[in-house]
Every structure is written in structure tokens, then in C-alpha cells.
Amino acid sequence: MGKNKKQAAEGEEARRGSESSGSSAEPSGAVAELPSFKKTAGGARSGLIEQDAVDTIREQTAVKFADEDEVVEQDEAAQKTEAVASESSSLADKEECDESKLDHFRKFFRRTSSRSSDEGEGGGMMERFINMTGGGMVPVVTEAPEEDEEAGPDPTAEAEAAAREIMKAHHLSSGQSVDMMSMSSSGESGFFMPVAEHYDDEYNPEQEEEQRDDMSEATYVPPPQHVRGGVLGSLLRLYQNQPGGQAPQRPGLRKSAQTLSSETLPTGESYEMPKFKAKRPRGSKIPNPIKLKRKSAMSEARITVHIADLLQRHRFILRLCKAFMMYGAPTHRLEEYMVMTSRVLEIDSQFLYLPGCMVVSFGDTITRTSEVQLVRCSQGLNLWKLHQVHSIYKQVVHDIISVEDASRTIETIMAEKNLYPAWMCVLLYGFCASMVTPFAFGGDWINLVVSFGIGCCVGLLQFIVAQRSHVYSNVFEITASIVVSFCARALGSIPNSNICFGSTVQGSLALILPGYIILCGSLELQSRSLVAGSVRMFYAIIYSLFLGFGITLGAALFGWIYRDATNETVCEKELSPWFRFIFVPGFALGLSLINQARWSQIPVMVCIACSGYVVTYWSGQHFTASTEFTASIGAFVIGIMGNLYSRIWKGLAMTAMLPGIFVQVPSGIASKSTLLSSVQSANNMVSNGTNAAVNSVDGRTSISFGITMIQVCIGISVGLFASTLVVYPFGKKRTGLFTL
């Protein structure tokens, strides 16, 4: 027992001495002096375990440096991609590395603890060694302070920061720049169109009601805040919304992030992309096919309805324009009417009027293109149909009826026949000629009957022959003036017939005088429509020369046939001036019926026409040498009455004023008797043959007739504009001024 106690004491002293010598050793030996540590641990098995720990530490240190180099390379490659994607990938990679290291050391600790469980003190020594070396990462003797552990990087905190960044990137608004999001192309987002601020593919009833209220409060129809896109833009929008549509690929475009990363990063068997562990559940990137199909169907239906509505509005604008031109709307305000209509319908369009045609351009704000349409038709006068079309125009502008109903109504109006057939118009032509002869050209009762017969011949040529022969319609004015002049001189040459040649010729040609043409031209010039006004004025002058040439040729033909033809241009017998006021209502009635006016419109027309003639007659008695001034006074009165009828009684001013304007033109022409100057030229042609003086006289008379027509119509246009300014000083609220 004594020896055993002595040996135990010596072993305890030796063990304490070895521990003191090991603790006094300097730690500068680091990894290279680790074999000295083996000497302190006795036993072969303990040496193997310690050698395994050293090898594990070296391997993990090398893995750490390799992982850090790999992270640096990945960071350099990820600079060419998006910030959010690169940051999330690097954080996930680092987290994976840390987790793998922790798992490895957990397994190693469990393995060593299981191996040393049978050795007693050896297991405690290994636990102390692992704790002193900081988990095997840095081999030091003393334990690391708690402050250094807290100062080190925390994988959990880094993972939470990365998660917050990913969530922030995931919830970015779609209105931000596309470059900050994923740049990979897809079938839906790969095809981009220019954003149109006025594209109205989303139907919003509340927004439309607010727009209508704003427009009703305005004093005129302003340009719409939102215009409808064109057909081409809608079709492109439909193509874009297709679920299976592929974006068009073009060489030279910017490559996606996946392509850039695959080109810059190394490839091969030695390189493996890091595998990330899903820390939170993520939704599938594949969209729900049922929702996609439903969304595509709704979008297609909405765009289809939009295209159909857009085409319907375009068709209505074209039909309305054609109806206005066919039925005699004021040409100097025609562009204004169409602009008002297009603004109300939210259509981006422009209009250019030329005599006989209208150029219409429909714009498309989506594709920056335009569709040009040309509306051509033969212009005429139909007062009743014009009244109906204007009523539809007002209802559409004030949003009373829909565009579809308005289009169908216009089609019905255009398909209807005229109120009065052609044979009745022929008789009305004779009636008007007989009515205008006494009060405008000084004819008596016998001349009234003769003018009726010759006027029926003119009506036959215009309504029957010219309508059936396009070739004859080009020479109608010349042939009609030749026939009228020849027949009137033949009848006037009958002895003791008391037929006045001058009054008969002028009365029979009163309805084909170019007064309305010159009036429209002067109104267009005064409205700054230079192209249309200049063309119409020049045509009216040439038209007047045609009439003068026809009168001269017809009178000369009868003079060559009958040498004793009459040369008298002034009637011997005239009716009392008071009888003239009786024939004016008849002439206005005949003009209204020829121009297809309804009987309900006639009383207002006749009243306005009679008032204008009374003013013209008495002003002519005072201003004998000023034809244009007299015409302007009469037109001013007619315009005041017509515009008041439109403003107070809500009638159509243009249709009410037109017969009164027609009454003013023959009166102005008769005041200077320019048509009769052609008879003097015809007499000189028959008596003197081909003389130079005769040609000069004929040229002066033809030009003087055209100049007289222009003077009268300019006076009428000035009076009409002055009357409009008095009644409508600020225009109308939403519709254009439908007046002369």
C-alpha cells in the first residue's frame, strides 16, 4: 500500500509538471508546432484522434479560403446582372457555405465524442481542446472573449437581411424602370408599344359621365382629353395580349441576364453552380392557365368591342359628311361641323374641304399613323333632307341618340326618294320663271305666260335630259342659254305680240344663274377658306361667261335666219310696282318646292323672302347706283330674321334663309341689265359681220356680266356675316352655326 501511494504521488507530480510545461509554452508555433501537442497526449488512440482533428482543421481552413475565392469570382461575374438577383445569390451562397461548415463540425464533434466516450479523461480533454480553439477554426490556447463572438458575422442576421432585400425587390411597383427588374424576355413583356395617354380601351362609365358634364358646361366643344386609338393600334394591342405570343427577336438587341451570366461564368465539370436551400415557400413561376385564358378572352372581347365601336364612329362621320355635301350644307362651315362631331365622338381626325370632295384623315395615337378617306359626291340642294340630317347631327352632338341609331337613320334618309318627282320639278321651273319675270325684269302678263313655257323647256333639259346623260350635263348651261335666247327672240319677233325679248330671256334663265355658286365662294373667302373659295369664284366667272356666250350665240342664230328679228330689250308695257309684291311670295314658294322643302317649312321661308325683297326694293329706290350696297342691306335683314328663327324657335336658319337669298340675286342682276348686252353683240355680229370692234364689245359684255354677279354676291355675303355677328356674337355652345 505504501509503494502504491508513492507511485501515485510521483505520477501526479509528473502530470502536473507536464501540464505546467505545456501551459508555459508560447502559442507562436501555430499549426506547424502541433506535433508537440501529440507528446502531451498519451496513447496511440488519442494520437490518431488528435491527428484527425488537425487534418480536419486544415481541410476546413482550405475550404474556407476556396469558398472565399469562389465568392469573389461570383461577385465579379454578378456585376453585369441586376443588383437584386446578384445580391440574393451571393448571400444564399455564403449562407450555404456557413451551414455546410457548421454541419460538418457537428458531425465531427459527435464522432469524436462517441469515440472518446470509453476513454474517460480523453473525451474531456478533446472537448476542452475544441472549446479553446474556437470550434476548430483558429488554434489558440485561451478561449475567445464573448465580445469577439458577438462582433463576428451572424449568418442568421445576414439571411434576414437578404430576405428583406428580396422581399423589397419582389414588391417593387410595376411603374418603375424595367432595368431594375429581371431582364429576361417573355412572351408577354417582350413586345413593347409606345404608351398612349389617350388610348381608351378601358371602359369607365363614371369617367365618361364626368367628361360629358365638363363638355356640357363649356361654351364650345374643346379638344377631347382622351381620344380613341385607331384600328391598327387596337390590333397590335390584341396581338400583345395573346398568351402564347412570342416577342419578336432582332439581332443586336440587348441580351438577357441569363445569357450574360452564362457567357462570363466558367463552365465545365469542375464548376458547379451553388445549390440554394429554400428558406421560405415561393409561388410557382408558371401562371395559372385558367386565369390566363380568362384574362386573354376578356381582353380580346374588350378590344374587339373597341374596334367595332371605332369603325362605327368612323363610318358615321363619313356618312354625315356625305349627307351634308349632298343636301347643301353651308360649305364655309362644313369643316367646323365635322370637327365638332369628331371631338364629341373622341375621334382624332382632320378635315380639308375642296369643292366637290372632302379629305378626311383619322389619326391613330398608338402607332402614330393616319387613315385617309376621300368623300366625293355631287353637291345639290334638298332642304327637307338637310333639315333631317341637321337634326340627327344635333342629337349626336348633344348625346341624345347613339352613333349606331344615327348611322341607320342617315342611311334611311339617303335611301328615301325626293318629296317631289322630276316631272313636277319641270312644271315648278316654268312657274318660277313666270313669277320672277314681272317683279325682277319688268315683264307684263303676256311675258309671264311665255316665260312659263320657256322655263319648262329649261327644266326639261335639267331634270330629264341632263340626269340621264352625263355627257350632256357638261354642256347644259350653254345649250340651255342658246335655246332660251333663240326661242325668246323668235317669239319676240312676232308682230303685234307685245312679247318682250329681254324680260323673257332673263326670266327663263333666272334659275340657272350662278348666284348661289358665287355666294358660296365669297363666304368661303371671307371665312379664310382660300382654296375652296378661289376655285368656286373662278368657276362662277367662267360659268357666267358660258351663259353670256350662249345668249349671244342663240340671238345671233335667229338673226341669221330671220333678218327682221327684234332688237328691243326694254318692255313697252310694265305692270304696276305694287303688283310686284304679289309675285314675290309665288317665286319664293316655287323655289322652296324645287329645292325639296316640306310644306311645314314653307311659311317661314316665304315670310323671310318677302321681308328681304321689301327692304331691297325701297333701298334701291334711294341708292340707285349701288347694287352691292342694296344687296347687303337686304341680306342683312334676311340673316337677322333667319338667325332669330333659329335662336328663339329652334329652327334651321340656313333652310329658312336660302329662298330669300335666291330672290336677291335676280333683282341685283336686273338692276344693271347685263344679260341684255349680249343681244347688242348679237345684232352687231349679224349686221357687221366679223369686225374687231364687235369682238371687243362681246368681251366687255361677258366680263361685265361676271363682275356684276360678283358685286351682288359680295354684298350679300357681307350682310349675312353682319347679321350672324349681331345674333350670335359668341357663337353657339356645342354645335356649329348652321347658317349662311
Swiss-Prot record:
It comes from Eremothecium gossypii (strain ATCC 10895 / CBS 109.51 / FGSC 9923 / NRRL Y-1056) (Yeast). GO terms for cellular component: membrane. Its main location: membrane. Residues 7-18 have a biased composition (Basic and acidic residues). It is found in: Membrane. Belongs to the ThrE exporter (TC 2.A.79) family. Residues 256-267 have a biased composition (Polar residues). This is Pheromone-regulated membrane protein 10. Residues 19-33 have a biased composition (Low complexity). InterPro entries: ThrE-like_N, ThrE/Ser_Exporter, ThrE_2. The keyword Transmembrane helix applies. It comes from the Eukaryota.
